[in-house]
Each structure stands twice: as structure tokens, then as C-alpha cells.
């Protein structure tokens, strides 16, 4: 058969090409609404795209009152917990009937979050009940959605509490006579309210966050912090804003909660109904129209909907062994599909798509991941690794989750190019080192050679790993403006620490680079929020030879008092207690320097900790006990060390013993000279 070319080939390629539409967020069905699971709800469907989010405004006096309360709670200067609890009770009384106005106000929504974090169980149920009938509306609101997320996390904690301490009463009441059901029933009632709107929530800018949190709660997964940088729930802007307004999570965050069995059934029902809406009630994968598959794939690369789809794929195995959502996105047969190939190529070239693929690889069945790898990526793994903002992250995911045979093949292909890959993606070095360690240090020598070639090349006259890896000359080191260490500095420091722990060559190289710095520059590293960890990482007593230890201590001991009183330097001072083992002169020199500045050291929070860790009270009051402590430390660190014998011991032995002793002394002397060299 003739090879297709020209217009026919171009037309076929354009047909198979995956190009997401610009209007993914709307995702309107082009089929009759009668096919949807929730039939006859046309009015609700129309409302779901534009829910009511205005519930009136507070008058000036009310606004000023709630503003003042918010600032009072933010300062948290209460004399007792009872006083704080009383204020929360009073605010909730004032807020009766105004809850919807408060949560949709920029300032007052912060107040409601603080109240929810501080209120007791009955008050929490009261707030939850006040939102009945408006949960969808509030989830779509810029400010109210954050309040809902806090409410859901606290509700999950109360759910577990009621589950572990059951009562015979299904209803409780507060002091005002207000009757509440169990938290489980209240939660299920809220979920029924949201069910008709699930599809629109998936791609809504704010409601998608609430939906993700609900899925995490229903599946008993970790509920992430709302402020930590690695939180999977909030957006980057949201986490920064939350830090600026200083709303701290309570103990209910960053935990996994037990949930009732009804939640698993509810999760299954919700996601099954959502699947039917996306597939228009198709009975099997083969019955789903190509248009529906394409539209769902568009959601996978949408910056709002993609995290929701990722989460659904991660947890669908709880209730669905067939993994319907995975099969909706990808095929499962062993043959290439042109449209799927175009979609995978788009994922590997798009920042959102590559993040999607990286995350679903971590939770998918291994046979599904292997299929994608062997069909579409195996033969071009190096090219993908060079896509530093997209495909590189997918390759790193393969290194973590593939079988040993495939990981070895990837390492064989990538390691020769490692020094080039590190130019744009330092994380690749971390992934390769971790993969090599898991495989019993597979190709470790080649990895080390490539890393040295990159950061400490032999042909360079001014080679310094601190400069090539940490970029010291352009860093915040030595700045007097109290600049925070940058994220890039933190990432580079962690990588260098990993290199130091990976191989002794990097430990030696790093120490040599530190000693080649001007002393002032080296000491500045000890006071830096990030680089101090690098200094700390090289202070490994058993791995560093005695000469290098002496050279390091000559510099570090010069400013030991100021270092001990510093938040970062004090950790290095603590580490020197062990690092000076068998170097008693240095240990005593540091101890005496700290004792000479007793007042300064003891007036510092960090200095007091160093004083304690160095047992300096013992040094001052019972010097012999302190020296005994040193001997115990040395014996613990070097249990096989030969104890020195008195010089006249050899004269007490017979001739043969003298000969053996002489040979032994010669041998140990020879070894010592070799060590010095």
C-alpha cells in the first residue's frame, strides 16, 4: 500500500490533533438534558452556572462592630480561654440571621473563619445549619468558599468524634433550645443539596476547591493545611493571602479522619452520577462518543478542573475496581490510538497537562502506567527529560513508580545526559539519586562523575561547588536588608546536602570549597537561614578525617559565642559538640569561650540551649565529670579505638613482646602518616 502523503496525510493529522477549546469551563452538554441523571431539573441547571451570591450588606454600625471583633480575635490578647470563649458566644449571638451577609463580605468572612476555628461543637452545628440551602451558592463565592472549607474540616473532626463516642440520642440541642441532628446527617443533607451542581462545581474557579475538600473527607484522606506551600487544596495566591491575614489552622488540619460507612456509599453515588453526566449514560466504554471523550480530556488540561479530575482518579479505586474515570481519559488496549497519542503529546507539552499526568501516574495501576510508557514515551525518554517545565516531571514520576527493569532502562538513557539536564532542572539530580539508591546504588559511579563534571570540573582553575551549585556570589548571603532566603536558594541547598550524604567525594569537595572561601564569607553562611544547613551537613564526625575537622574548627571556633546566640548558628554550635570528639583541645577551647561570655550566652534563648547541650554547668562546677562525659562520648562514637598505653609498658614485657609491640607501633605510625597524607 502506498504511503499516505500530501493533503490526505495533513487532513488526517489535523483530525487526530488534540486542541482544547478555549471555553472549557462552561462545558455545556450538546445532548438533551433528559439523558442526565437528575432529570427535570432544568431550572436548577440554569441556576448552577450563575448562582445567587448577594445576600444583602451590613449597615455601617454592624460593619464597624464586626471589624473591631475581627481585629480583637486576630491579636489574641485574651487573659484566659474562658474570656475568648465568651466573646465567640457573644459574636455568634450578634451574627444570628446575618451569617450569609458576613461570609460574603471580604472583612467579615475572615471573622467567620476565626469564629469557626474557635467555636465549640454545638456552635459549629449552629453555623452549619445557618448555611442550609445555600451551600452551593457560598461555594461559588470568592470569600465564602474559604469559610466553607474551614467549616468542612472542623465538621470532619466532629464527625470522627461522634463516631468514636456514639450516643443513643440522634438529636442534641443548645442553650437556646435549637435542635440539631448528628453531624453525619447534617453532612449528608448538605451533600444532597450539592449533587445537582457537581458538574458545574468541577470547573468553577472557587467551588472546585470546596468539591476537592469534600471528596477528601468522604474518602478519608489527609485534609491538607491551608497555609503550607505544599498544600494540595488552596491555590498559590490563596495560601499567600492567608499567611498575610494571619489566620492559623487549628489542630483539625493535616489529619486523616475516620468517617461512617455511609460516606463511602455517598462518594460512590456522587462520582458515578457525575460519570454518567459526562458520558451521557453510556453503558460501556465503547458506547461513549468520541466527542464526550474529547470534552472530558479538555477538562484534564483545564487549570481549574484538572486538580479535581486528578483527585477523582486517585481515589476512584476505593469503590470502582474498573477505574472508569481512568478509562474515560485513556484507552486500556495494547495498541496505539492516534487521538490518544495526540492527547498524550499535548499532556507532555503543556504545564497543566504534565502536572495532571505526573499525579495520576502516582496513583494509577502499574499496568496502565506501563502501557502509556511503552506505547508513547519509551523511545524518546531523553527528549522528554529535556522539556524542563513539562515532560521532565513526568519522567521523574516514572523513576518513582515504574518497575525495576524500566527504571534501569530510563537511568541508562538519562545518566549520560545528566550534566546537561541539571542546567535547567536541578530536581532531576534528586530523582536520579533516589532511583539509584533504591536499586542498590545502580550506576552510582556514573552519576557521581556526571555531577562532578557539572559542579566541580577538573579543568576549571577556580572550581568551587558552593559557587556552581549554590550561586553564592548572586545570593542573599551577607545582605544587610534582612532578605528572606529565596525558594531557589532553598532548593539548591537541599540538593547540595543530598550530594554530601550521597557520596564521600561530595563531602570532601564541599569542605574544600568552604575552606577556600574567605573566613568572613564562610562564617556568614553559618548565619544564613538556608546555607547554614549546608555547613551543618558537613559536620559528620565519622566521615571527615581529623585534619579536615581541625581546619573547619579553626574557623568555626573563632565566632562561637555569636554563633551560639543565633537562631541558625546555634544548630551548628550544637553539632560541634560531637564534631570535636577526640579533639579535646578544640572542645575545651569552645567551652571556655562560651563560659567567658556566660552572661551573653545565658541571656539568649538559643544560647541557653547550646549551654545545656554542651553540659557547661558541669564544665564550670565539676570539670572532671565533664571530662568523663567526653570520654564516654568518644567511646560511644569510636568503640573500636585502641587505648593508648604508657610509654614504659614496653619495658615490662619480654623480648618477643617487645618485638611485637615495636612492630605494632611502627604499623600504627605508618597508618597515621598515610592518613595525614
UniProtKB/Swiss-Prot annotation:
Entries under Pfam families matching the protein: PUF_NOP9
Region (Disordered) location: 1-50, 639-677
Residue ranges, compositional bias (Polar residues): 646-655
Keywords: Nucleus, Repeat, Ribosome biogenesis, rRNA processing
Organism in which the protein naturally occurs: Vanderwaltozyma polyspora (strain ATCC 22028 / DSM 70294 / BCRC 21397 / CBS 2163 / NBRC 10782 / NRRL Y-8283 / UCD 57-17)
Gene name for this UniProt entry: NOP9
Name used for this protein in its record: Nucleolar protein 9
Cellular component terms (Gene Ontology): 90S preribosome; nucleolus; preribosome, small subunit precursor
Record function comment: RNA-binding nucleolar protein required for pre-rRNA processing. Involved in production of 18S rRNA and assembly of small ribosomal subunit.
One annotated GO biological process: endonucleolytic cleavage to generate mature 5'-end of SSU-rRNA from (SSU-rRNA, 5.8S rRNA, LSU-rRNA)
Keyword Metal-binding found: no
GO molecular function: RNA binding
Location(s) in or outside the cell: Nucleus, Nucleolus
Amino acid at each position: 500500500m502506498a504511503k499516505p502523503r500530501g493533503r490526505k496525510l495533513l487532513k488526517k493529522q489535523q483530525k487526530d490533533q488534540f486542541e482544547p477549546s478555549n471555553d472549557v469551563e462552561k462545558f455545556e452538554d450538546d445532548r438533551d438534558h433528559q439523558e442526565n441523571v437528575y432529570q427535570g431539573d432544568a431550572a436548577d441547571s440554569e441556576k448552577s452556572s450563575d448562582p445567587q451570591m448577594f445576600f444583602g450588606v451590613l449597615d455601617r454600625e454592624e460593619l464597624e462592630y464586626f471589624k473591631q471583633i475581627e481585629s480583637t480575635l486576630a491579636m489574641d490578647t485574651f487573659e484566659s480561654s474562658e474570656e475568648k470563649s465568651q466573646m465567640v458566644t457573644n459574636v455568634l449571638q450578634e451574627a444570628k440571621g446575618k451569617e450569609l451577609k458576613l461570609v460574603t463580605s471580604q472583612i467579615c468572612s475572615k471573622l467567620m473563619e476565626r469564629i469557626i476555628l474557635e467555636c465549640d461543637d454545638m456552635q459549629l452545628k449552629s453555623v452549619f445549619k445557618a448555611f442550609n440551602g445555600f451551600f452551593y451558592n457560598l461555594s461559588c463565592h470568592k470569600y465564602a468558599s474559604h469559610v466553607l472549607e474551614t467549616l468542612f474540616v472542623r465538621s470532619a473532626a466532629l464527625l470522627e468524634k461522634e463516631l468514636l463516642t456514639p450516643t443513643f440520642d440522634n438529636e442534641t440541642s443548645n442553650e437556646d433550645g435549637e435542635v440539631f441532628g448528628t453531624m453525619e446527617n447534617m453532612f449528608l443533607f448538605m451533600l444532597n443539596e450539592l449533587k445537582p451542581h457537581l458538574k458545574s462545581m468541577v470547573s468553577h474557579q472557587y467551588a472546585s476547591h470546596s468539591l476537592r475538600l469534600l471528596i477528601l473527607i468522604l474518602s478519608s484522606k489527609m485534609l491538607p493545611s491551608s497555609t503550607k506551600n505544599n498544600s494540595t487544596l488552596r491555590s498559590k495566591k490563596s495560601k499567600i493571602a492567608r499567611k498575610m491575614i494571619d489566620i492559623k489552622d487549628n489542630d483539625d488540619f493535616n489529619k486523616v479522619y475516620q468517617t461512617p460507612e455511609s460516606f463511602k456509599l455517598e462518594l460512590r453515588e456522587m462520582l458515578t452520577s457525575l460519570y454518567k453526566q459526562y458520558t451521557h449514560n453510556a453503558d460501556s466504554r465503547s458506547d461513549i462518543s468520541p466527542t464526550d471523550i474529547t470534552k472530558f480530556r479538555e477538562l484534564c488540561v483545564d487549570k481549574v478542573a484538572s486538580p479535581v479530575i486528578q483527585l477523582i482518579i486517585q481515589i476512584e479505586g476505593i469503590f470502582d475496581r474498573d477505574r472508569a474515570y481512568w478509562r474515560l481519559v485513556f484507552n486500556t488496549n495494547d495498541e496505539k490510538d492516534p487521538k490518544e497519542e495526540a492527547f498524550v503529546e499535548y499532556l507532555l507539552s503543556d504545564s497543566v497537562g504534565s502536572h495532571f499526568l505526573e499525579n495520576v501516574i502516582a496513583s494509577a495501576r502499574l499496568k496502565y502506567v506501563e502501557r502509556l510508557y511503552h506505547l508513547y514515551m519509551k523511545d524518546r525518554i531523553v527528549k522528554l527529560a529535556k522539556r524542563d517545565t513539562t515532560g521532565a516531571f513526568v519522567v521523574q514520576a516514572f523513576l518513582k513508580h515504574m518497575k525495576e527493569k524500566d527504571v534501569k532502562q530510563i537511568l541508562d538513557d538519562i545518566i549520560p545526559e545528566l550534566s546537561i539536564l541539571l542546567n535547567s532542572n536541578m530536581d532531576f539530580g534528586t530523582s536520579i539519586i533516589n532511583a539509584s539508591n533504591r536499586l542498590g546504588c545502580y550506576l552510582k559511579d556514573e552519576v557521581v562523575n556526571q555531577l562532578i563534571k557539572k559542579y566541580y570540573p577538573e579543568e576549571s582553575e577556580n572550581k568551587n561547588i558552593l559557587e556552581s551549585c549554590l550561586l553564592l556570589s548572586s545570593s542573599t548571603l551577607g545582605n544587610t536588608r534582612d532578605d528572606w532566603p529565596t525558594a531557589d536558594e532553598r532548593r539548591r541547598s537541599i540538593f547540595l546536602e543530598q550530594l554530601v550524604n550521597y557520596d564521600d567525594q561530595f563531602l570532601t569537595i564541599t569542605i574544600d570549597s568552604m575552606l577556600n572561601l574567605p573566613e568572613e564569607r564562610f562564617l556568614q553562611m553559618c548565619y544564613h537561614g538556608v546555607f547554614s544547613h549546608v555547613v551543618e551537613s558537613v559536620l559528620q564526625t565519622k566521615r571527615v578525617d581529623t585534619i579536615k575537622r581541625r581546619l573547619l574548627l579553626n574557623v568555626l571556633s573563632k565566632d562561637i559565642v555569636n554563633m551560639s546566640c543565633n537562631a541558625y548558628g546555634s544548630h551548628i554550635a550544637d553539632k560541634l559538640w560531637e564534631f570535636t570528639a577526640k579533639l579535646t583541645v578544640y572542645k575545651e577551647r569552645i567551652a571556655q569561650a562560651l563560659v567567658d561570655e556566660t552572661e551573653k550566652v545565658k541571656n539568649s534563648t538559643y544560647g541557653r540551649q547550646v549551654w545545656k547541650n554542651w553540659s557547661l554547668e558541669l564544665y564550670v562546677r565539676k570539670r572532671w565529670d565533664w571530662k568523663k562525659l567526653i570520654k564516654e562520648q568518644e567511646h560511644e562514637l569510636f568503640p573500636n579505638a585502641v587505648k593508648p598505653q604508657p610509654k614504659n609498658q614496653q619495658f615490662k614485657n619480654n623480648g618477643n613482646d617487645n618485638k611485637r609491640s615495636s612492630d605494632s607501633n611502627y604499623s600504627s605510625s605508618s597508618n597515621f602518616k598515610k592518613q595525614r597524607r
